[in-house]
Amino acid sequence: IKQNNIIKKEKKLLLVSFTILEDIVKNIVGNEYNVESITKPGMEVHGYQVTPSDLVRGSEAIIFIQNGFGFELWAEKFVTNLDVERITIANNLEPIFINEDIYKGKPNPHAWISPKRGILYVDILLEELSKLDPENKEKFKKNAQNFKNKIKKIDEDFSLFLNTLQKSKRYLVSCEGAFSYLTNDYDLKEAYLWPVNAESQITPKRMARVINLVKEKQIPAVFCESTVSSESQESVAKETGAFFGGNLYVDSLSKKNGPAESYLEMLEYNLGTIKNGFNASLKN
């Protein structure tokens, strides 16, 4: 039998810092590259410890893509050990700043939580990846447009839902203060038990503050995140009579067969969970 002597071209590696970014990049580049995330689904990203095998993958990659805004506390050290170019999304984004605790004045890194900012992530990555590979620019552009249309649909559906909510009820109460971009973009007010997960010790003072706010404003539902324990927030719900709406995905996509295996699924799941939390509480 005559052997097929076409040598399959090995795909180059684009290494990214976390799973949400991995999925966004894959949606733009399609099958042109291998795209891999250093942190795996369900992992806490802020305080991740780099492993020797991560450094090996880093040395094989043609680029390292990160969020920035201090999200990947380990990235500076990681990149210092490697001779690899870097794309940092935050260099092209307007930050919202954290306004309390030791993180006061530092940028909140979680911009991707808002569909409106997710569209900006796609635009920034499209531009940077087109510079990296001008030959595939048109293909990337087409992929990016398709992806943005899907995000836009999620954005529009959520806006329509919020229009049905009383202004006084538009509070998003979470464990981590990760939703500033979402609350900012959709005219919601934000409250949380701690500003960033790296600082996830709940103090009696913080707890009391959130409980008082939920009672005073009669906030219908409270939420937590998938990578931390929801125990404290469930106590808030019990104490106030608010509905515990469940866990939202913030720093990581879900593991296989979970509800948020892709960025679009994550947006749909989060916004659907928020919607259901408000709706269920209104029925009670």
Task: Name each model-derived stretch.
Residues 1-284:
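Extracytoplasmic metal-acquisition and chelation regions
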